[in-house]
Amino acid sequence: MIHRMLKLPERQSCLLFGPRQTGKSTLVRSVLPAGAWTVDLLEHDTAMRYAKDPSLFRREAESKIASGARTIFVDEVQKVPALLDEVHSLIEKHKARFILTGSSARKLKRGGANLLAGRAVMRRLHPLTLQELGESFDLERAQERMYDWKRRG
């Protein structure tokens, strides 16, 4: 795995946004503490259950918190924006730490979603930087490969 320069807060809740395929989920999974609960909203049945009844997420999260989970990771939160209100409530009640990933804060704002102002820090993960790629990245070779790929169609 490529070491990313972005650091997530260790104790505070966090909303991590960025373009698709930039490594948001991979980054979060690499720093999750043991016992964290992960909810993947790319799993259609999971997203549908919570979209149908967002309070189900709160009840399940409270059960996980009661069992000792102190960090809850919700991947692709833009799939079920109503969960942000439940997360807000859970942060207030239980002081649990949430890490939420999504591709577009702008889309959530337009939809009137609760972006947890004052309760979670917002971070943005950009595509890899040259510093993150390090010495193993050969720009000339990459350009040649792109040219070959483009030429072949």
Regions found by a protein language model. Give the residues of each.
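Pre-Walker A adenine-sensing motif
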Residues: M1-R11
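Hydrophobic anchor at the beta1->P-loop junction of P-loop NTPases
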Residues: L16
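Conserved lysine of the Walker
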Residues: K24-S25
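Short glycine-rich substrate-engagement loop in P-loop NTPases that contacts/grips substrate
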Residues: V39-T71
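Conserved P-loop NTPase "ATPase switch" module shared by AAA+ and STAND
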Residues: I65-L83
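Structural recognition of the conserved hydrophobic beta-strand(s) that form the central parallel beta-sheet
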Residues: F73, R97-S103, R124
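Interdomain motor-coupling "hinge/lid" segment immediately C-terminal to the ATP-binding subdomain
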Residues: G111-G153
